[in-house]
Structure formats: structure tokens, C-alpha cells
């Protein structure tokens, strides 16, 4: 009995000894549960956070806390990470609040989720390129630019694409968009209206070589010039030099045997290519591609060649166009057997001496240059699926079909072997980049064309709607759970999270600052998406905004919003790659303002003047010089003249109309251009007319938003795009706001297809030329022009001019008080005033 009693006492003591520990862990669990349920952050909309589990080690005095996925959706900085740990220590009971606490989210301690660019110390070298660096010549270089870039994206190769595109739906035997027609657009069209006219030019202005797996040219015409077959009226020509003669390579090359192509047919296997040994002497032997251009306009120029064992890295191409001759160096040691983009140029209709491409055998290296087909213009879709082609311009199609036309292997553009075009198109964007980059320093484990792409960026828009006119905002996606957590160069896939964080942080800051709102930042998802899983390099998807939400698109249709988004993304990519390579960066300047062209006292000269634009968000984005581009008559713009200061004097030949635009440049690259101003000196001038361009407005389409109706009345007013846009699919048909979220004809925003493939004209910023040509035709009067900004600031005096011509265009606001006063004073002094515009009758002011 005594033994039994002693055993009972011992058992009781043991149980009572465990009670405090059990009670403590329950206490910890309850406090952590409450903390995460009530957790809120102003940084992002991340949904509901929860405690997943925790482990406590009293012996080693450690506490490991694991939060759910949502907690990892937010951005982490050194400041908010320290604040989170302070909060945990304050809420936890003793003695655990003195333990070493580690909080995990997204599979990492949260301090590891602080992007490298925000760390003052302790950089994660596993997600930096470090010594991994491409040191050769870029794939393509425009060497006619009158300035050099040293702290931009020079020699960087980036793959960028704009979401989806029209595709063949196998199970329904029809061509269709990948996303629904809503609010006058589709995702397939909308994101393209940011990527093509804004983002890609900004990256290229910073010096980057940009590849996009969808056709970038909105030109519906296409001309092929080749040594095998040519578009009718076009011509391929070769000139030999002594013993240096053009020969046929042993590899197959491009030939256009058909107008339409079935699946799994490669036009880059149907023809031949030519090669010749190089010489250091200039232009002794060359090949010429002379197109028969069907219609005057802008055309992209793509070249092609084969990469041969003796290929040189400085093949010299000359593009003759309406503005003159632009010279390129192409590294033929990479990227053979596909279309290689050089640039977009203006060409006159027909066959012209100033419309051709020339490849010289001049090189600083001993080897060979290779010549295959040259392509002018984007063209129409020509891939047959289900017995038919798409019937739309190629730029509207998905990447799968451009990949076939660009000579990609079948397994690259059709992983499903022709069974599922939808999946193939999604995969092709990444697989094309991998194929092009295979064998490069950034993708050494795959075979390919050795182009050193080091980043991919996919711009999408998302679904989702709000019924209270609130914003849905931006979401970022990356993938780490693939290939043992590494990209093909061996660095951590968490480098993609850094990129995603930088882009979302930049967007929230830039959009909020520019538009005076709080732009909605959503989550950062670490999920298994093809476009972030398959790329061999760091990659991200940006769901820019919701194409299903009126408030997002009302802002999203504004050209200024598109510019802001593109500039923000460009800046983030610039800073990200500078961090990855431990290099300095400079942000390219904003466009100049207060542009004016006046007559100089010296005979037959014009003075150009302007002022730089400060960027309050970017201290490095200061202009260090300028480039003045000149156009004569109906020609194109030349390659530009570098100017150090903010004025430039031009000698003019009487009888010719001169047009000018100015860009600002610095170590980081080149800004977007100014408005275009024109000037003319009559041979026997009776006086000078001043043309004042007051038409600077751009806007989205007309909108309506009341208790019952919501949407965009594109038919009434499509808005004023920057230059032009292809963003619209058709007119909105359903405006019933109670039907939000329905993606059929019964749903809010449902739209037609009347505008698909159309380029809607916008503000070209080139109207002084139009008015000036009329003045020239009238005879005996010269003219100069200026921005209305210079009249309002007082830097342009109206009194010396015989007449003032105010271009008010589609401006729908009242003339400013300063402008009204200047015009009043001019008229009171006997001046002659002509003013034109769409809203002049009710917008002149008091």
C-alpha cells in the first residue's frame, strides 16, 4: 500500500510539472493566432493572415513561427521586419519573449525576403549574378546614335512580352482571344498598348536589346527580300570584290515558298543563305535588299543570317530610309536562323534608292558575314490552324504563331505537338527565350542560339472587380519551387522575388505620386505559373490592373498612365540589373518642354531652344545633353545631332520646310521626344507667321459612371491616344453595372469586335508641319513655331509676327489666363490671329 501511494505521489508531481509548459504553449499559440488574424499592413492588400504552426525549444531558447502563404505576399523591408519582430516580442509571454525568434513566410525567414536592393548589409549573394557577366558585343547595336550610354542597360538583353494574343482553340475549331471582350478591349490588346509604344522603347532608349515573342510591328503590310524568293517587285543584289565572292552556305536558310504555312513547317529550312569573307576595307563587297514597299509608312526591319564557325561579331548593316542612313552592328556569332530586329523606319511607296538594307563585308575581325532574308513590316498572320489562318494582323496573334514564322523548333512553339494551342502559346513565350539564350553565360545548361538574355518580364492584366468604384490594382507572380530552387546560371530563384518586389514597389510609388491617389498594391504570389517557372533566367509576371474593373481601366486607358507604368517598370528593371551586377545606374531623363523655333538675326538660320524637365521621383534623371533630330519636307527624321546646351542654331535652305524634335540624354539613355515643331524660310518673304502648338492633350475614351450605367462610350469619343493605339476591340454594348463580373453578353462591359486590327489615330504632336505646309502653299510668307508653354511663360513674344496661328486641336479646356492676356495684347497691337480647334466655340474663355 505504501509503495502504491509513493508511486501515485510521483505521478502527480510529474503531471503537475508539465502543466506550466502546456499552459505556456497554449498561451503562445493563442497570442500568435490573434496576432496573425488581426495583422494588417498598409504596404499591400494580402488577404487574411494566419498562424500555420510554431515550434519552441526551451533548452536552446528558440521560437520558430510559421505563417501562412498570405503573410509572405507582402513586401519586407529592414524597417517593417524589425517592427514585426518587436511586436512579437511584446505580445509573447515570458520567458519566450527573450528567446531567439524566427518568423517564416514563403519558406524563408522574413529577413531573407528583404530584397537585396533594400539591404544596407548582408546581401544575399546567391541571388546576384556577381561574376556571371556577358562581356562580348551586343546582339545588335545602333552605332549611328550621336551619344554613348554608360550607366543604363547597354549590352543587356531582356525578353519582354505582352500577355496573350489571338489563338486557335483546338476543341472548338475557331480562332479567338484568350480573354473576354470587356469595356472595349481584351487583355490580349490592352497590355500591348503599354508594352509596344512605351515600355520597349524606354528599355531600348536605355541601351537594352529587347526581344519580344509576339510581333511588335502594327504595320499590316510585309515585304520579304531574299536570295531565294522576293515579294514581287523587290530585289536582292550582291557585289563581289576581286577574289572575295559570295557563296552559298552548307546549312539551309530562309525561303518563302508559300503564303500560308501548315503546322510544323519551318520557312528557315526551305532556302539557302550566302556568306563572304570579311575585309578591313570599307564596303568593297556587299549584299543589298531592295524592297518594293506597298504603301508609304513605318516598317520594322528584321534581318536574318546563319551563325557559322567563322562568323564575326560586328557585321555592318546599313538601313537606307526616308531620314537618311542608319548603321548597325550585328553580332552574327549568336542568333542565327531567326528574325533579328534592327529598328522601325519610314519608307516611301515603291522601289527607292533611299529604301533598302545593305550588308557590307567590312569588319574589324577576320572571318565571314552571312546574308539571308530581310523582312520589312509586321504583316498578316500566315499560320494555318484548323484549315484557316487567323485573318488578323500578325501583331494580334499569340507568340506560338510568330515563333513558327521566326524559325523556332517545333518543340519550342508547340510543346503539345499541335494538340493544344492555348497551352503552347503560354509556354512558347518562355521557351523561345530559352532557345535563343541557350549556351549563353546566363543559360549554359541548354542548347540554343547563345543570345545572353538575363531577365524575362511578362505584362498581363487580371480579372476581378469592385462594386464600389475602388481599384483592384497590381499583382506580381514569381516561382521558386522548380529546378532545385535555381535558375540555369545557378543563382537562387528568389532573385525573381526581388524583381517582383521592385516592380510592385515602384508602381505603387510612381502611380500614387503622379495621379494623387493610393494605387492598390496586391500580393506577391510564389506560384507555379508557366511564364515564371519555365524561363531559364529570373522572371516575373505583372498583373498590371484589372481589365474587368471600371475604376482600373478608367485610369488605365489614360496615355499618361501607360507612360507612368512603363517608365516605372523600366526604372525597376534598370535598378534591379544594376543591383544584380553591382554596377551604377542613371535613369533616362523625362522629355524636354518649352520648345520653340525662332528666326535668328543671321540670314537663313533658325534657333531652337527648350528647357529640361526635372523628375521629382528620380534624382539621377537629369539631362546631361540633348539630341536634335531634323526632318526636311516629307522625309523622315535623321539620326540626330548631339547638343550640350539648351539651344541650337540650324542653317536653313530657303524654300524647304524643316521639322525638329528634341530628346534629353544622360549616361542612362535617352528620353521620349518633344513635340515636333516646324519652320520655313520663304525665298522672298513678306513676313513671318508664328504657329503656336497648344494641342498637347491626350486622354482615354469618354466614360460614364452613375447608379445604373458604367463603362466607356468609345463610339462617341475614343479619346486621344499618344500617336495612335490598337487597344480597342470594339464598342461596349452592355452598361448595366448590376451585371458586373459576368463575362458573357449579359455582363457589364461586354463589347463588340468592330475595331480589332484598327489603329485609332491620336495626338501626333506634329501639327505645326500641317499648318506650315498650308502657309508655304499660300506663298511669300515664312513661318516658325513654338509650344504654347513658351507663350504662357513669356519667353515667346508675339508682337514681331505678321500673324499668329494657334493650333488648339482637340483641347477641351479653356485657354489659360496667361495665354488669353498674351493674345489680347497682340490683337490690340494690330496683330492678326487665327485659332482653330474642335471646341473653340465654347472653350476660348471669358
Describe each region flagged by the PLM.
Residues 649-670:
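Beta-strand-rich modules
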Amino acid at each position: 500500500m505504501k509503495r502504491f501511494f509513493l508511486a501515485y505521489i510521483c505521478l502527480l508531481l510529474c503531471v503537475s510539472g508539465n502543466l506550466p509548459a502546456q499552459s505556456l504553449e497554449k498561451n503562445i499559440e493563442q497570442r500568435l493566432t490573434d496576432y496573425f488574424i488581426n495583422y494588417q499592413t498598409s504596404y499591400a492588400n494580402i488577404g487574411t493572415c494566419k498562424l500555420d504552426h510554431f515550434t519552441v525549444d526551451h533548452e536552446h531558447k528558440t521560437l520558430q513561427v510559421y505563417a501562412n502563404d498570405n503573410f509572405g505576399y507582402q513586401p519586407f523591408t529592414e524597417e517593417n521586419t524589425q517592427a514585426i519582430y518587436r511586436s512579437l516580442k511584446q505580445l509573447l509571454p515570458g520567458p519566450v519573449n527573450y528567446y531567439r525568434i524566427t518568423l517564416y513566410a514563403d519558406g524563408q525567414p522574413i529577413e531573407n525576403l528583404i530584397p537585396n536592393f533594400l539591404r544596407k548589409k548582408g546581401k544575399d549573394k546567391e541571388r546576384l549574378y556577381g561574376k556571371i557577366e556577358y562581356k562580348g558585343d551586343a546582339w545588335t547595336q545602333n552605332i549611328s546614335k550621336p551619344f554613348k550610354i554608360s550607366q543604363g542597360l547597354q549590352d543587356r538583353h531582356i525578353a519582354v512580352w505582352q500577355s496573350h494574343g489571338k489563338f486557335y482553340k483546338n476543341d472548338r475549331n475557331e480562332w479567338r482571344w484568350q480573354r473576354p471582350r470587356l469595356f472595349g478591349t481584351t487583355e490580349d490588346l490592352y497590355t500591348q498598348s503599354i508594352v509596344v509604344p512605351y515600355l520597349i522603347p524606354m528599355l531600348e532608349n536605355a541601351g537594352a536589346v529587347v526581344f519580344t515573342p509576339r510581333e511588335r510591328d502594327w504595320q499590316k503590310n510585309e515585304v520579304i527580300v531574299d536570295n531565294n524568293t522576293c515579294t514581287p517587285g523587290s530585289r536582292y543584289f550582291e557585289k563581289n570584290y576581286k577574289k572575295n565572292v559570295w557563296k552559298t552556305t552548307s546549312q539551309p536558310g530562309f525561303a518563302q515558298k508559300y503564303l500560308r504555312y501548315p503546322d510544323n513547317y519551318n520557312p528557315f529550312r526551305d532556302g539557302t543563305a550566302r556568306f563572304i569573307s570579311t575585309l578591313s576595307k570599307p564596303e568593297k563587297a556587299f549584299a543589298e535588299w531592295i524592297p518594293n514597299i506597298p504603301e508609304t509608312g513605318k516598317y520594322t526591319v528584321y534581318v536574318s543570317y546563319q551563325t557559322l564557325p567563322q562568323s564575326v561579331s560586328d557585321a555592318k548593316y546599313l538601313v537606307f530610309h526616308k531620314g537618311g542612313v542608319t548603321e548597325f552592328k550585328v553580332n552574327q556569332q549568336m542568333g542565327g536562323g531567326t528574325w533579328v530586329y534592327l529598328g522601325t523606319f519610314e519608307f516611301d511607296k515603291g522601289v527607292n534608292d533611299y529604301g533598302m538594307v545593305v550588308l557590307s563585308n567590312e569588319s574589324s575581325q577576320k572571318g565571314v558575314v552571312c546574308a539571308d532574308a530581310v523582312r520589312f513590316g509586321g504583316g498578316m498572320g500566315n499560320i494555318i490552324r484548323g484549315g484557316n489562318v487567323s485573318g488578323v494582323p500578325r501583331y494580334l496573334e499569340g507568340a506560338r504563331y510568330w515563333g513558327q514564322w521566326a524559325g523556332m523548333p517545333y518543340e519550342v512553339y508547340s510543346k503539345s505537338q499541335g494538340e493544344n494551342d492555348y497551352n503552347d502559346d503560354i509556354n512558347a513565350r518562355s521557351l523561345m527565350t530559352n532557345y535563343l539564350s541557350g549556351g549563353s553565360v546566363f543559360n549554359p545548361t541548354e542548347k540554343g542560339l547563345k543570345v545572353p538574355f538575363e531577365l524575362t518580364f511578362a505584362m498581363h492584366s487580371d480579372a476581378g472587380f469592385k462594386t464600389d468604384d475602388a481599384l483592384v490594382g497590381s499583382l506580381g507572380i514569381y516561382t521558386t519551387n522548380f529546378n532545385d530552387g535555381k535558375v540555369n546560371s545557378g543563382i537562387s530563384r528568389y532573385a525573381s522575388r526581388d524583381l517582383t518586389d521592385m516592380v510592385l514597389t515602384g508602381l505603387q510609388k510612381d502611380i500614387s505620386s503622379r495621379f494623387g491617389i493610393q494605387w492598390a498594391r496586391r500580393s506577391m504570389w510564389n506560384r507555379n505559373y508557366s511564364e515564371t517557372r519555365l524561363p531559364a533566367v529570373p522572371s516575373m509576371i505583372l498583373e498590371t490592373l484589372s481589365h474587368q474593373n471600371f475604376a482600373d481601366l478608367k485610369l488605365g486607358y489614360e496615355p499618361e498612365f501607360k507612360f507612368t507604368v512603363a517608365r516605372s517598370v523600366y526604372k525597376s528593371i534598370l535598378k534591379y540589373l544594376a543591383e544584380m551586377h553591382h554596377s551604377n545606374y542613371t535613369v533616362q531623363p523625362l522629355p524636354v518642354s518649352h520648345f520653340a523655333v525662332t528666326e535668328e538675326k543671321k540670314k537663313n538660320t533658325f534657333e531652337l531652344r527648350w528647357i529640361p524637365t526635372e523628375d521629382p521621383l528620380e534624382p539621377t534623371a537629369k539631362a546631361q545633353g540633348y539630341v536634335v533630330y531634323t526632318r526636311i519636307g516629307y522625309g523622315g527624321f535623321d539620326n540626330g545631332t548631339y547638343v550640350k546646351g539648351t539651344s541650337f542654331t540650324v542653317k536653313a535652305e530657303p524654300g524647304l520646310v524643316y521639322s525638329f524634335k528634341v530628346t534629353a540624354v544622360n549616361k542612362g539613355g535617352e528620353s521620349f521626344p518633344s513635340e515636333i515643331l516646324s519652320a520655313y524660310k520663304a525665298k522672298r518673304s513678306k513676313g513671318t507667321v508664328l504657329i503656336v502648338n497648344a494641342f498637347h492633350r491626350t486622354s482615354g475614351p469618354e466614360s460614364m459612371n452613375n447608379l445604373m450605367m458604367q463603362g466607356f462610350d468609345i463610339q462617341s469619343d475614343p479619346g486621344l491616344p499618344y500617336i495612335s493605339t490598337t487597344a480597342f476591340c470594339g464598342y461596349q454594348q452592355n452598361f448595366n453595372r448590376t451585371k458586373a463580373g459576368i463575362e458573357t453578353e449579359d455582363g457589364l462591359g461586354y463589347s463588340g469586335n468592330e475595331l480589332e486590327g484598327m489603329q485609332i489615330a491620336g495626338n501626333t504632336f506634329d501639327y505645326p508641319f500641317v499648318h506650315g505646309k498650308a502657309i508655304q502653299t499660300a506663298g511669300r510668307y515664312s513661318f516658325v513655331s513654338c509650344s504654347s508653354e513658351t507663350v504662357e511663360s513669356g519667353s515667346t513674344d508675339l508682337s514681331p509676327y505678321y500673324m499668329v496661328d494657334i493650333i488648339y486641336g482637340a483641347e477641351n479646356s479653356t485657354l489659360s489666363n496667361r495665354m488669353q492676356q498674351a493674345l489680347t495684347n497682340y490683337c490690340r497691337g494690330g496683330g492678326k490671329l487665327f485659332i482653330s480647334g474642335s471646341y473653340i466655340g465654347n472653350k476660348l474663355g471669358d
